[in-house]
Amino acid sequence: MTSEPASYKLVWFVPEEALDATRDAVFAAGAGRIGAYERCSWYAAGTGTFLGGEGTSPVLGEAGREERVPELRVETVVPADRLADVLGALRAAHPYEEPAYDVYPLAS
């Protein structure tokens, strides 16, 4: 019998200028708490690539052309009961038409 995880690791990719807005949004929705600490996260710089298909409106670059943009990879923890709200907050605060993010279950 498999039980649901108590928490998840949320990883998202964002341009540096939107870092604070996305962090503020996910923290306000309940992410980033570890014991008595709040707003816990980790981030590092990298390069994101994407090619917007027909009918897309990329915030950066143009549809039909592969783009390479500097981005940050941001990680934080999310309690299972806050996951849906945190993901909604991330999508609302993120500047991209299709935000890239991953959710990983954490072992207890």
Per-range role (PLM):
Residues 1-108:
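Hydrophobic structural segments
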